[in-house]
C-alpha cells in the first residue's frame, strides 16, 4: 500500500510491524506513527538475536518510550531467514503467533521494504 496523505486510508482493528530497529531512527518513528493512525491497536515486534551490538531489550525500550500508544514486543530468536524453507517459515509463524498479544489479528501488516 502506498502511503499518500491526500487519500483516505483504510482502518484496521489490529496492525503489525516487524523489524530489527537497529538502531531506531526518525524514519521508523514516522512509519510507526503512520501505521498507528490506521489501527485501533498497533503492535511492533522488535526482532533480536544474541550478540547484537545494541541489545533488543534496549531497542524495544526506546521504541516503547517514543511510542507509548503502541504495544512493543521484543522477539528474541536464533532463526535464520531462508524464506524458501517451509519448515523454517513455519517456525517463524509459530514464534510470531506466540508473541501476538491479542485474541485476533493481525488484520494488517505494515512493511517498508
Regions flagged by a language model, labelled:
Residues 1-113:
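Nucleotidyltransferase catalytic core that binds NTPs
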